[in-house]
Amino acid sequence: VRSTSMINSLVDEYGKDVNFLMIYIREAHPIGGREVPNNQFQVNAPTTLIQRCELAEDFDDRIQMQMPIVVDTIDDTVADVYAPWPNRMVVLDGNGKIVDVGIAAAGGTRESSRQLPGLLDRLLKKEDN
């Protein structure tokens, strides 16, 4: 959530050349789970895909991501394949090959956002050749 403005800036800068997509996998701090003080999202962990979709929509309404948001299956297919927990950027090249898996740690999305321009510049230069 704290990295939203950084990510939105990347979408503004690279969005004409790069497809950005956020995948809502699961609530990081549900009520009765790994709660954090002053969490602006006081929600229960979803038990159905419809509930997860509603949480993703609420998240987007509050956070205003400037990219499409899709939702993982309730059995966590994307989470199991890409291991993006808690937050992680995964970069695919134009052929769908994973070229970078961001940092999976507190603050990892912010740090990945700082590193992403260099990576995207290199990838876009390669694809132009």
Which positions does each model-derived feature cover?
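Loop/turn elements at helix/coil->beta-strand transitions in domains of secreted/extracellular proteins
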Residues: 15-19, 64-68, 86-87, 94
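Thiol-/selenol-based redox modules, centered on thioredoxin-like
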Residues: 75-129
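Short loop/edge segments at beta-strand edges and connector loops
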Residues: 71-73
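Short linear functional motifs in flexible/disordered or boundary regions
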Residues: 19, 32-33, 68, 108, ...
